């Protein structure tokens, strides 16, 4: 379970379905590919179509990460803070639906952050905020990466906090938005030039 995020996700994680309420996750192959890629590698960039279940995948990956690690900080960012907090809300719902023996004790349970007794934290915010500046980040997840404005300035401010560790992880997921920073990251990954694993979800 600790070493297999796919088994953990399909066995224990539930998500809210519009018609059926809480339902177990049944992962598609590409979701399994993303889970495996970010578990086995440090940097993954996912070029995805809309409504492709990327948020569900992120919920599964992050929940597994904070349950089975100690003293890790996850930064969950999006170009809009509300979008990041919505993903955090989904993680909270999935966490509350876990069996009691899998849950960690909760220290902090706020709108924009959670902290557990194993020392793990999740911070949600916009890429334009100072939410994670100066913090030591173990896992950086950016949703809709292609739509982040002032990318160079933003990434220059956060990269030192994630490059200092030997096991830190970065996960980008986004729909395309022209030939910008996300496009360049994806191309670099495809050409094996930047250390990212590239996954495309048509």
Predicted regions and their residues:
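Phosphate/NTP-binding elements of NTP-utilizing enzymes
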Residues: 1-202
């Amino acid at each position: 379970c600790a070493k297999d995020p796919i088994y953990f996700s399909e066995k224990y994680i539930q998500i809210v379905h519009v018609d059926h309420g809480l339902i177990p996750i049944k992962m598609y192959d590409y979701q399994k590919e993303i889970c495996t890629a970010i578990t086995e590698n440090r940097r993954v960039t996912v070029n995805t179509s809309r409504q492709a279940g990327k948020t569900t995948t992120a919920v599964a990956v992050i929940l597994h990460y904070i349950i089975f690690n100690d003293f890790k900080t996850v930064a969950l960012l999006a170009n809009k803070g509300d979008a990041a907090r919505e993903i955090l809300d989904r993680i909270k719902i999935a966490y509350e639906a876990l069996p009691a023996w899998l849950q960690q004790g909760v220290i902090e349970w706020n709108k924009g952050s959670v902290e557990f007794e194993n020392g793990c934290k999740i911070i949600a915010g916009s890429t334009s905020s100072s939410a994670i500046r100066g913090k030591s980040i173990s896992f950086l997840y950016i949703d809709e990466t292609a739509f982040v404005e002032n990318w160079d300035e933003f990434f220059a401010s956060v990269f030192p906090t994630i490059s200092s560790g030997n096991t830190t992880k970065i996960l980008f997921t986004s729909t395309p938005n022209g030939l910008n920073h996300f496009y360049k990251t994806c191309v670099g990954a495809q050409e094996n030039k930047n250390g990212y694993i590239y996954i495309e979800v048509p």
